[in-house]
Amino acid sequence: MNVDIGKFAGFCDGVKYAVENTFSQASKKNSDIYIDGHLIHNPQTLDMLENIGVKTYEDDEDMSVLDGKTVIVRAHGISPKRREALSSHAKKIVNLTCKYVAKIQGLVKKYSSLGYRVIVIGNPVHPEIVGVCGYADDVYVVYKDEDLNKLPNDSKKALIVAQTTLQKSAFDKFVAQIQDKYKDTEIIIKNTICAATEQRQNEVLEIAKRNDSVSVMVCYSAVHTLPYP
């Protein structure tokens, strides 16, 4: 039996950066380390971190458990409000936000300050999007067709960005629909899907063409590997 493994399989650069730096922080043993939520969507890696003493802070816990601790901001990033809350307890904040997510945060912050409405195409409950939305005053998330009906019927200028792990076809579809809704409005479109995501999406299509079946090995909580709604 022939097994065809994709050349882009494995951790992307953002995940590698977060994982390597978390292990590096743990090796210093300067203080107890907590990750604000799950560092990445990979249970094996999370188990390895737990085995060396790195703890995961969950939202249902009292934030006082972070007092005097080192707190790691996971690859998905967080909102400014969340960072402020963590900083009021932690001794040290280590920001391991993926550089592509940080780019979106910067765009949203910039254009929001210039008076633009921000339209984010992505999953509203995904940690990345929750964090990104925290950088805007006037922000809407489009994930399903019915979300388009929630957009205001006005002519306010807008910025459109995408979740880094979004399917390109979904981005193109919603951009076209938003443009159709706001024909006389200034709209700035930024395709912020990361290169690694597009590479994997394109590669799996090519692999499917030359094989009888395709298996995707992934964590069940990684919503971007599921079919788009």
Could you tell me what each predicted segment is?
Residues 1-229:
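The feature marks the mature, well-folded catalytic cores of soluble enzymes
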